Amino acid sequence: MNKKPIIAIPMGDPAGIGPEITVGALNKKELYDVANPVVIGHGDMLEKMLPVMKADLTINRITTVDEAMFEYGTIDVIHLDNLNVAEVKMGTVQAQCGKAAFEYIRHAVQLANDKKVDALATTPINKESLKAAEVPYIGHTEMLADLTKTEDPLTMFEVHSMRIFFLTRHLSLKDAIDQMTKERVHDYLLRCDKALEKLGVKERRFAVAGLNPHSGENGLFGREEMDEITPGIELAKKDGINAVGPVPADSVFHHALNGRYDAVLSLYHDQGHIAAKMTDFERTISITNGLPFLRTSVDHGTAFDIAGKGIASTVSMEECIKLAAKYAPHFVTA
């Protein structure tokens, strides 16, 4: 019996690089050694990308996961007939593409909710195309949260052996600092610990990054560490969380990459993003925690400027599928 996890891959915005990186990734036999991938998309669009990606593959249009072959050389696609492929102009914002991209995701979510697939590995969508289609979301995370009735999903990056969580995300630095309260640090460490537990990570050693130079150096360069961050860490430790810090941001990610910590809690968006993407831009993969299913995602956009040219790297998509396959057997929904 084939026990490899079934990974659903929504095709993304048809006018972006989603279809071609999907084809390119599934042209790698090693992916089929660890996963059973099934695409949710439009078979004609994938077929159009075969010569672009120089892929000698067959497109198997299906209506249910049970019909999938899960064999290298064949791309199984749950074909949604929701797109006029002849009118798709690569690299442009189009309402039909935004609508189709949303419908691929919605279908994948339903499959996950029905336990037909073990995880989602998502490809890029475009905010402007969604808006043109009057789809009321700005991105995947908000969409998935609403479709699953999940409040405040938690984002984690993984690159090589390093995991990074984010205390704040899309805020100005000034506003992010205002959010760095001891209560928030405490709450997020509890949530991060639960997230890793759900992924099957047994040992969970956390480091919290510092905000100021040298983590403030006892108030010499700022009091945020003394007044908020350290007290928040201490509250988490009282609840049994294995956490240290604040550790100066110029060294904490280096130590995590070398195995001293199992995860870092980054305080603001760019602090963690820079660390991850300087380590390996293409292999930085996002995991959305807090959903009722496992979801991994490439951490790049639709790349309209190169879409349809066959030059987009497939490395991130490959890593996205591999990471979903890595964690899916251990993922706990409760």
UniProtKB/Swiss-Prot annotation:
It holds the Pfam family PdxA. Binds 1 divalent metal cation per subunit. It catalyses: 4-O-phospho-D-threonate + NAD(+) = dihydroxyacetone phosphate + CO2 + NADH. The keyword NAD applies. The keyword S-adenosyl-L-methionine does not apply. Its EC number is 1.1.1.408. Substrate binds at residues 140-141, 277, 295. GO terms for molecular function: metal ion binding; NAD binding; oxidoreductase activity. A divalent metal cation binds at residues 170, 214, 269. Its cofactor is a divalent metal cation. InterPro entries: PdxA_fam (IPR005255). Keywords: Carbohydrate metabolism, Metal-binding, NAD, Oxidoreductase. Gene3D superfamilies: Isopropylmalate Dehydrogenase. It is an enzyme of class 1 (oxidoreductase). Belongs to the PdxA family. PdxA2 subfamily. Catalyzes the NAD-dependent oxidation and subsequent decarboxylation of D-threonate 4-phosphate to produce dihydroxyacetone phosphate (DHAP). Homodimer. This is Putative D-threonate 4-phosphate dehydrogenase. It comes from Halalkalibacterium halodurans (strain ATCC BAA-125 / DSM 18197 / FERM 7344 / JCM 9153 / C-125).
